[in-house]
Regions:
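Conserved SAM-binding loop
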Residues: 113
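Extended, histidine- and acidic-residue-enriched regions that form the cofactor-binding/catalytic faces
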Residues: 1-110, 118-252
């Protein structure tokens, strides 16, 4: 099967993809601390892996290509730990606008922004109306683990959903980039299990992770992670994305 990855195709291949009215998946992620046991590139590794696997499942039924991953996002709340890059709001929107403009100029009309970092969600939701109006593209934005939230829950032991450097992300990294996981640091890789209870309040507030939420950089419990679980989690995430790509009503 030919590659679904933009970076592995020729310009001629990509002109053919545009002529076939392919959906462009644009992975957006982050480069930020992920506790003592995981590399800072977790969100980028996992988002790209899910996008690739989902596209490979869908490409038999719908033309699709995975654009290069935008590896920097909104990560101010992790800066105190070190190892983190972050955009401010105007820069993030400007970069996304430039990416979408390039995609449109090559003849593509449908773009699926697939996010892999919780800190990007609010910004993407806020940007979407303007980016859609300005670009004229059929444009969706999602977060890959939200697409499969109900299916992920069956594999989790203590957590209710995906958190940070947690059971889910650590298990998936044991599959996607196993050599980057420091297994000897797993005994200390845990924090509050189900996120900040203050999020239940009907008001918004900004809280940096280090001084307010976790001393380890972890929310959840990475001690529950294993590669077998990671395979299952990766599979359901890919299937959730593939289902969205193949949804004819979405892309009509």
């Amino acid at each position: 099967m030919p590659s679904v990855m933009w970076k592995e195709l020729t310009a001629e291949d990509l002109r053919a993809k545009a002529a076939a009215n392919a959906i462009v998946i644009l992975p957006v992620a982050s480069m930020e601390q992920h506790g003592p046991h995981l590399p800072v590139g977790v969100d980028t590794f996992l988002c790209e892996a899910v996008c690739k696997a989902g596209a490979e499942l869908a490409v038999k039924d719908v033309p699709v290509v995975v654009a290069p991953t935008l590896w920097c996002g909104m990560a101010e709340h992790h800066m105190a730990f070190g190892g983190t890059f972050t955009f401010d709001i105007p820069t993030y929107m400007a970069v996304l606008r430039a990416f979408l403009t390039s995609i449109k100029r090559h003849g593509f009309t449908k773009v699926f922004i697939v996010n892999g970092h919780g800190g990007n969600i609010a910004a993407l939701n806020a940007f979407l109306p303007d980016l859609t109006r300005e670009s004229g593209l059929t444009l969706y934005a999602t977060t890959y683990f939200e697409l499969s939230k109900a299916d992920l829950a069956q594999f989790l032991e203590d957590q209710k959903s995906v958190h940070h450097a947690c059971e889910v992300e650590t298990s998936m990294m044991m599959v996607v980039a196993p050599d980057t996981v420091k297994r000897d640091r797993l005994p200390e890789a845990y924090g509050m299990l189900n996120g900040d209870p203050r999020k239940a309040y009907p008001a918004a507030r900004y809280l940096p992770f280090k001084d307010n939420l976790t001393a380890t950089g972890v929310i959840g419990d990475a001690r529950r992670a294993n590669a077998n679980k990671g395979e299952k989690l990766l599979k359901v995430c890919a299937e959730g994305l593939a289902a969205a790509l193949k949804n004819k009503e979405m892309w009509a």
